[in-house]
Amino acid sequence: MITTVQEISKWRNLWFIRMQSRKWYPVLKKTPLVADGRKIIKHADKVPHPEEIIHPFYQPTAIEQFTACATEYNPSLLDGKKIAPSLIKHPVSLKTILVDSKLKFDDIRGVNRWLMEFVARRQHQRNIVLTPASKSVRSFHVLHLSSTDIAKLRALENVLSEIENTNDLQSRVESVNNELQNIFDRDSKQTRLFCEDILAYLIKNYGNSTEKLILLINVTEMQLYSRLDQMKAMNIILYHILCKVEANENPPYSPTLVTALENLLAAINNRFFPGRCENSLHPIVIEQLLSYFIKTGNLNESKNFLGHLIKKGILPEATIINRYLEAIDVHFDKSTKIFDIRSKFAFIADLAPIIENYGTIDLFKFLIPMCRHFDELCSLLNIIRKSNNAKRAVDSTLPIFIKKVLTFTKDPMINSGNLSTVFNMVSPIYGQNVPSEFVEKFILSFALQGNYTMMAHMIDTYKIKLSHKYQLQIIRALKNSERNHALKNTGAVGYNKEFKKYFIEKYLNCTEREALRP
């Protein structure tokens, strides 16, 4: 029994401290963490912080947000399924790991705050403005060599011209490097000859073969600790090297060339930086390196350079982005396995601003198969609807959307509802006059669900002509529906025997319809 003012005050303070110590974000039930088939530890499996979720296009609608905030027990997004790609801290090693998380809360506390932060983060990504890398490269790559300067390089050019093979690469590199040093030794102190201009000139004019380009890359590496003492100089040289790589060879590149170039990049990092040099590279050089690493199949470096470009507010060329997506598909063999989809999300997480504001048809086609929940699909479709090329994008992707809708569940009524949602979302783009080719695809999809009411409604509303061939397609779809959804929803309005009989008699006139009679 609490009898004194001091005791009352003590218990009140304890209660206050306890309330203050509660985690703002709700915690899920404790679940075992398993790795390599062994239980490591039981830990509190939290709903990830919004900053930890790397999904580049999922945005909960107002209805989803309201439902989550109005549900007392276990409110969730994406039906609480384990499909939200996240980068979280491992509870034991504290290393960052990639997982599929469940956006499922214990109760309603803190859900509104979590949603506000998540939506704010998506809004921030939406507001990022990207501009293409400047096509005017004169500002950093112009060679400051006069005709008099070039005349001083004659002996060096002769050395390069006399090299017929690079079998003894080291001795050839030393010969060129020694002659380069002689030029500086002979030259007066008043000269404006710079090592970067000489090397860029040689690369531009004598780097037309893979062998000589490798030789000049090695000479460049040797000069890193003598005359190439600024990152600005390396921008000039890297630009010309990468131009030659692009012009000289088609992938796959020579392994020796790849090794030489990547050794040079590593040497640049060691010379100027303790880590990586992207911050000091010109955006065009970063874009060149991105293109190079995509072509060599180095996805990790490609992701690094792509993310760095976007963080700097640079929009990569559409062709480069498309090649990057193709490289991801090649690496994962267009897999739809859960683990591979999660890994794919890690490689495209940086693309959020591009998806939101600069999405292309190829990018949207890449993203549709990655959706594992209908709400993800709706988020993507909403982005397409708001894009500058909405109609053209929907024309190209709608058949893929329709097909994808039917993969989330086997329940014909849910599928029918989802098909109706997609149809209603795209109708305004066409001024309610959806092209008949798309309406016909919707009708066949409703037939696969055995939904006679929606089929009849769309045929009448859009005055679809039922050719003999199209009737046969409908019949095949209805037969598949009967096999796949046997005895399910047979009494529901729109699905029952009466509606089936009515539909067959009114809309089908080919002899094959007898096979469908109830």
From Swiss-Prot:
Cellular compartment(s): Mitochondrion
Signal peptide segment: none
Entry keyword set: Mitochondrion, Transit peptide, Translation regulation
Primary localization: mitochondrion
Keyword Acetylation set for record: no
Transit peptide region: 1-19
GO cellular-component term (any): mitochondrion
Domain of life the protein comes from: Eukaryota
Functional description taken from the UniProt entry: Required for translation of the mitochondrial OLI1 transcript encoding subunit 9 of mitochondrial ATP synthase.
Family: Belongs to the AEP1 family.
Identification of the protein by name: ATPase expression protein 1, mitochondrial
Organism: Saccharomyces cerevisiae (strain YJM789)
Organismal lineage: Eukaryota, Fungi, Dikarya, Ascomycota, Saccharomycotina
